[in-house]
Regions:
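Surface-exposed recognition patches
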Residues: 1-271
Length: 271
């Protein structure tokens, strides 16, 4: 949940910028692009892995990347399929849905479940809405059937982004997200407070020092400006009556949306 990786590699078919900013990827930043000419899997390492279109129940293997991509739609795989045993650990509704895609890099798992997040449809939208031309990570299932579930916002400024995670042990985590406009407003308030202090600086920087918006497109992909600010443990079945008083991790960003610093639960800067 808290891990992240950096890659300066720029693919020609990138996924959108993730919640840690340009170049950084979280495990849940995996994304599948569904195009007429094929499928493009953007992994958490920044790569774009291309596959041919899949029929329901079909599995394709990329030898160059040692990765399988599958499409749901069948209850079971043929016994000659190397992934037939691993297929059976998936929930039945996942196996049977032709709208769900799955990826794995090992015959022992885990499976990455690629589906679309729930959202609140528009007032004039025809129901049910058509599946989008992409899939995002909604869960991870290990070889024993234990599931890590990602909860995404259905509406609002951060619609579609991961705001909660439930692990196989039943622990629940809340991800606090901010928009560029919210960070800019917080910067201005902090600046105003420091200027009003006797010990504060005497000159204020212009409002352009922290813009309300970021450029929509970058070399790393489209950027909506949403960033991860903090991760909280909100429920632990082993300690149901205990509530943490500090986040597990906290993150700060520059005015241009780049990751500046990372703090652990003790408040110590670790990056």
């Amino acid at each position: 949940i808290l891990s992240r990786a950096y890659s300066s590699y720029r693919t020609r078919t990138p996924a959108p910028v993730g919640v840690f900013g340009p170049g950084w990827k979280a495990p849940f930043d995996i994304r599948l692009q569904i195009r007429d000419e094929g499928l493009i899997l953007n992994d958490s390492g920044g790569r774009s892995i291309h596959f041919e279109p899949l029929f329901p129940g079909e599995i394709s293997y990329s030898r160059s990347e040692s990765l399988w991509l599958a499409r749901g739609g069948v209850a079971a795989q043929h016994s000659s399929q190397p992934l037939s045993a691993l297929w059976q650990v998936l929930p039945e509704d996942v196996r049977l849905s032709p709208h769900v895609y799955l990826a794995t890099n090992s015959l022992q798992g885990p499976w990455w479940i690629l589906s679309w997040p729930e959202r609140v449809p528009g007032a004039d939208e025809v129901l049910p809405p058509e599946p989008p031309a992409y899939r995002v990570l909604t869960g991870v299932v290990d070889g024993f059937g234990r599931t890590l579930t990602f909860h995404r916002a259905a509406e609002g400024d951060v619609a579609g982004a991961v705001t909660g995670v439930t692990d196989g042990a039943g622990r629940c985590f809340h991800l606090v997200l901010t928009t560029q406009a919210q960070r800019a407003e917080a910067f201005r308030k902090q600046r105003a407070t420091s200027l009003s202090s006797p010990a504060g600086p005497r000159s204020a920087s212009s409002s352009s020092a922290f813009p309300d918006t970021l450029p929509a497109g970058t070399e790393y992909g489209a950027d909506n400006g949403i960033r991860l600010e903090a991760v909280w443990l909100t429920h632990d079945p082993a300690y149901p009556d205990e509530q943490p008083t500090a986040p597990l991790a906290r993150y700060t960003y520059t005015a241009s949306g780049e990751l500046r610093a990372v703090y652990d639960r003790s408040g110590t800067q670790v990056r």
